[in-house]
Amino acid sequence: MTHTQIHRSKWQRAALVLLLGSMVQTAFAAVINVSAQENLNDALARAQAGDTLKLASGTYKTKLYIDKPITIEGPADRSAKIVGDRSGRTVAVHAPDVTLRNLTVSHSGMSLPAMDAGIYLEETATRALVEHNNIIDNSVGVYIHGAAESMVRENKIIGDATLRVNERGNGVTVWNAPGAQVVDNDISKGRDGIFSNTSTHNTYKGNRFSDLRFAVHYMYTNDSEVSNNISVGNNMGYVLMFSERLKVYGNIAVGSRDQGIMLNYVNYSEIHDNVINKAGKCVFAYNANYDKIFANHFENCQIGIHFTAAIEGTTL
């Protein structure tokens, strides 16, 4: 046997071991029913990787620290309520391949510097799936703190409207989470709907935003997509800053008190097929270079397009 054949054989054996391990884990995965009278943390401690905890309707007054790949799922009406104690993170995920589905998650701590959140996805929580939940009355709704390839979709996220806007958390905060997606959520009454910072290859699409400061707020997020979102009655719609190679299309902003779209140091990007209706300025561009802005519909704005500072190579 040649050296190449030996090397290939070793890789094939390794791949087979991984496949068999995955099959064994799947074969032995259990569904564990949990009632609201039980201790949810005890059930979580007993669960093995790959298991599903199916929560009955009711209130679970606890905080969760998830350190194994499992699924926690409630009834379709989201009547399984995980209620925190107003400190820290109500649900903190630190393992990969965790799914949270059909839950109501509330009462996180309210410290912005401490990154308190209803659901917190740590860097190790790669490929997390957060779907079909009510995430209400928290600081940040979902904090994606480095969890690459995570998905947050079809959730209802409502902030604490009793606080001043700048004291509230964002609906979803994304920090350095390559490939993370935020899709088809309804986000309201927070500070920003989605705040994306220092990340790349993200997709934010199909979301609805209302009663916020900014619908989408970008900082240092490159090679990403903002598409088919709806912003209604926010201070500003899509605030995109210090980012490159963005695709911004199919979005709607209605009733923005200031700007529908803001481009601040956004370069080499495409902004097209967006609808801006009723804003102070439909588009405000500051030092936005080599962008392509085309096929947009602007209506009922005091100023249609306002360019300032150095604008080079941008086409309209």
Where does each model-flagged region fall?
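Bacterial N-terminal signal peptides
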Residues: 14-26
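Right-handed parallel beta-helix/beta-solenoid
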Residues: 26-42, 57
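N-terminal secretory signal peptides that target proteins for export/translocation
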Residues: 1-10
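Extracellular beta-strand-rich solenoid/capping regions of secreted or surface-exposed proteins
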Residues: 41, 45-49, 60-73, 81-126, ...
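Extracellular beta-strand/beta-solenoid scaffold signature
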Residues: 83-92, 113-122, 137-144, 164-177, ...
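Parallel beta-helix/beta-solenoid
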Residues: 48, 67-68, 77, 86, ...
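Soluble, non-transmembrane catalytic domains of enzymes that act on hydrophobic metabolites at membranes
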Residues: 281-284, 294-316
